[in-house]
Regions:
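Amphipathic alpha-helical interaction elements
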Residues: 16, 30, 127-130
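Helix-loop "lid/cap" segments that line or gate small-molecule binding pockets
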Residues: 1-16
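Conserved phosphate-coupling serine/threonine residues in phosphotransfer and NTP-handling enzymes
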Residues: 56
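Short, acidic loop-to-helix structural element flanking the phosphoryl-transfer center
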Residues: 4-5, 19-53, 92
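Asp-based, Mg2+/Mn2+-dependent phosphohydrolase catalytic module
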Residues: 59-60, 67-150
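Short, surface-exposed acidic
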Residues: 14-26, 147-150
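Hydrophobic alpha-helical core bundles mediating ligand binding, dimerization, or RNAP-core interactions
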Residues: 6-10, 25-28, 59-66
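A generic secondary-structure signal
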Residues: 13, 41-44, 101
Length: 150
């Protein structure tokens, strides 16, 4: 979704003007940063030999900002930003797009997300799912699953 459409949808829901919402949306990117500990998990997964891909429900302006200011994208082989493919999680279509683009499928594909219904959608699609709640919880889950060493 682009900034204009996002602003229109949110403004309508919360009762503010579209212009006010656009201003707010445009001010957010500089505040985006990875959670402490998550980049280390990406690095460790990559070092363990896992191919990493991302699916992100993010407006195009946020995606561009993150790509140009953060180096954690180096750990990913590829990814999909919803704004660029005009499809969002939890739509089954975005998981199909990912299967085709990344050449992945089935239980060997592990989907990690902080939104439970997105994880459930991935599981319905046949992927294994991990509901992210904190870096500590994620690391422990990955260790328990033998995807990372303790």
């Amino acid at each position: 979704i682009d900034t204009e459409n996002l602003a229109t949808q949110i403004a309508h829901r919360v009762g503010v003007s579209k212009a006010e919402m656009e201003t707010l949306i445009e001010s957010i990117p500089q505040h985006l940063a990875p959670l402490k500990g998550t980049v280390k998990i990406l690095s460790d997964l990559k070092s363990a030999g896992h191919d990493l891909f991302f699916l992100s429900n993010m407006p195009a302006s946020y995606a561009h900002y993150l790509e140009s200011t953060h180096d954690f994208f180096q750990y990913f082989s590829d990814g999909l930003f919803s704004a660029r493919v005009q499809c969002i999680k939890p739509s089954a279509k975005i998981f199909e797009m990912a299967n085709n683009k990344f050449k992945v499928s089935g239980k060997n594909t592990i989907f990690i997300d902080d939104v439970k219904h997105n994880v459930e959608a991935a599981e319905l699609h046949g992927w294994a799912g991990i509901w992210f709640q904190s870096p500590t919880q994620l690391r422990q889950t990955l260790v328990n699953s033998q995807l990372l060493k303790a």
